Amino acid sequence: TVLRPATVTVAIDAGATHSLDTYLSPLFYDGMHLRIGFERQRASRFNPERWTHKIEAGLTYDNPSNPAGNNSLHTIIADVDFAMLHRWRVAQGLTLHAGADIGFRGGVTYNPRNSNNVCSPLIRLYAGASGMAAYRFNAGRLPMTARWQATLPVVGGFFLPDYDQSFYEMYLGNYRNTINFGFWH
């Protein structure tokens, strides 16, 4: 029997956001960002010595305000990401991982001051590359892992309506510039 240990991480992120949603407003909004995230990484069944898979999921809440400070947006986003990573043991305690990933982000931004378009849907699908470096060490008798990771979307699709374009127009068939395809070029 081959051991397939799993690493589970729960993280709480807090910080700042600088956002622009041109469907709701032509202005940049700055403010608070909160996220709770979950990650599970485990050695794969087919080759546990060299391959791992990673699943990440999270829930984000942003509450930025406009430059005048008299209006704020409320954004809720859920995301999920799956990656298959090849693992190389470079040195004692140091491993490098590289592979492909796919992901989804979906949510809504609400602007309480707008009368016609009060919310903006956020839908993104992507595929890309992922990399990670992990170093295991002991701090006294406590085992620790320091890790750096990056995900780079390569290709994707997203829903992005134009400023002041109503959902009624889209319902009638005017999808101009609402569903977009993105890639490196």
Model-derived regions: residue spans:
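Extracellular loop and loop/strand-boundary signature of outer-membrane beta-barrel proteins
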Residues: 20-28, 63-72, 114-120, 181-184
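Hydrophobic/aromatic-rich structural module bridging two neighboring secondary-structure elements via a short loop
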Residues: 61-108, 119
